[in-house]
Design a protein with these regions (language model features):
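Extracellular/periplasmic periplasmic-binding protein-like sensory domains
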Residues: 251-328, 395-402
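Beta-alpha junction/loop-to-helix N-cap segments that form part of ligand/metal-binding clefts
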Residues: 57-64, 77-147, 156, 214-220, ...
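Flexible, small-residue-rich helix->loop connector segments that border functional cores
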Residues: 69-79
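Extracytoplasmic ligand/sensor domains, especially the bilobed periplasmic-binding protein
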Residues: 107, 111-212, 261-286
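N-terminal secretory signal peptides
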Residues: 1-10, 14-24, 33
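Extracytoplasmic "Venus flytrap"
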Residues: 46-67, 89-95, 118, 182-190, ...
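Segments of small-molecule ligand-sensing domains
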Residues: 310-324, 331-391
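C-terminal segment of N-terminal export signals and the immediately downstream linker at the start
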Residues: 28-49
């Protein structure tokens, strides 16, 4: 059980865990089990994620997942017989703020591991503070563009190979060969599009145009006109919030879907379904490691989903594109590694994490590829229908990330 006393009250909408946390400063929370006492040597787990800013919906879900997993660990007696203390810092969708707050986790709190970061630009901003300067293990839970091979940094979200190799051929078969790549102007879209273009062209498709926009752009009238006038079949989107909602709405109003166009977006999940009216994204295709639609057929996924919804009812959903599944996977792999290592120092845990496996998780089992610092996992293609997703394709087994 968690301490319910607040030393300072700070409420962020319906951010579920704040009512059970000790707020230790602006954007800082500590969650400690009641059975922890001065005689116990705490294992300190740091979470650095966007609780505020445009990606706050994702960060709040990720922090809730961390709270759920740590509660399970502590209710079972902790790790190595020691309580796990959860320390959460707001990266605020702002890299300069994030660096300062992550530095607190490393220098002041001396955490044993940090998990977090949503965008790749955020990961790049905080990884040096954690790994190089802080000599601390770092787990990055979000789907991303690949090519992150920093020592002591482990990735537990999907890579371009996992999201594109089977998904793009499906799009060509179920959408068409003429692709547009409208994109936010930062590292993830730029690097992902290089990979996506190769897969499109090697499967007989064609990239009609590839464009990049400021992250805060909300007027896409010229882009929509270009899509319509060039008879684009498939929009392979990497525009992110706050721009993605207006973009999809403008595309819908221009008749793209009505005229047979296919929307696709590899980070779209149950959280982002709520960005637009259901009819504005009907038929949108996504490829992720988990969708809630899997729960009727997968008891392990159903159990995880139900536990999350019981503890955290509200608008911040357990969803893959928001890194909630990567957060769950990362924490369970870390737990397995600590148990194997029998200690929490960086080198020992990293050596065990390098080959860690979990038999059950959202979407299925997962395992680190030895020497590669990335996960094999199952992948699913789903299509938006009436405000939910239908699974339309799935990998035959665990998909190799093909990284490092």
């Amino acid at each position: 059980m968690f301490n319910n006393k607040l030393s300072r009250r700070r409420f962020l909408g319906n951010f579920a865990f704040t009512s059970a946390a000790i707020a230790t400063g602006s954007g800082s929370w500590v969650i400690r089990p009641d059975w922890a006492n001065a005689a116990e040597r705490l294992i300190k787990l740091g979470i650095a994620t966007d609780l505020t800013g445009p990606l706050g919906y994702a960060g709040k879900a990720d922090a809730n997942v961390a709270r759920m997993v740590v509660k399970e660990i502590n209710d079972a007696g902790g790790l190595l017989g020691r309580p796990v203390e959860l320390l959460i810092e707001d990266t605020a969708s702002n890299e300069s703020v994030a660096v300062g707050n992550v530095r607190k986790l490393i220098q002041r709190e001396k955490v044993d591991m940090v998990l977090g970061g949503i965008t790749s630009s955020m990961r790049n901003a905080i990884k040096d503070v954690i790994v190089a300067r802080g000599k601390t293990l770092y787990i990055y839970p979000q789907l991303y563009e690949g090519k992150e091979c920093t020592p002591y940094l482990f990735c537990t979200g999907p890579t371009p190979a996992q999201q594109c190799d089977e998904f793009i051929p499906w799009l060509i078969k179920n959408g068409g060969k003429r692709f547009a790549l409208p994109s936010a102007n930062y590292v993830w879209p730029h690097t992902l599009n290089v990979y996506a273009r190769k897969v499109i062209e090697s499967n007989g498709g064609e990239v009609i145009f590839e464009e990049y926009y400021p992250l805060d752009q909300i007027d896409f009238s010229s882009t929509v006109s270009r899509i319509i006038s060039n008879k684009v079949d498939v929009v392979f989107n990497t525009v992110i919030p706050p721009g993605v909602g207006p973009f999809f709405k403008q595309l819908y109003e221009a008749g793209f879907l009505k005229n047979g166009g296919r929307l696709s977006c590899v980070y779209y999940d149950e959280n982002t379904l709520n960005v637009n009216q259901a009819n504005e994204i009907e038929g949108l295709a996504s490829c992720l490691d988990y969708f809630k639609a899997l729960t009727p057929e997968d008891p392990a996924s159903a159990k995880i989903q139900a536990a999350y919804e019981k503890q955290f009812p509200g608008n911040f959903l357990f969803a893959a594109g928001s890194a909630a599944t990567g957060t769950y996977r990362g924490l369970k792999l870390w737990e397995a590694a600590v148990k194997e290592a029998g200690k929490v120092d960086r080198d020992s845990v990293a050596a065990a994490l390098d080959h860690a496996k979990i038999a059950e998780g959202p979407g299925g089992p997962a395992e680190m590829v030895p020497g590669k610092h990335h996960c094999k996992m199952k992948m699913y293609t789903a299509v938006a229908k009436g405000g939910n997703y239908d699974i339309v394709a799935r990998s035959a087994g665990l998909v190799d990330p093909k990284e490092c």
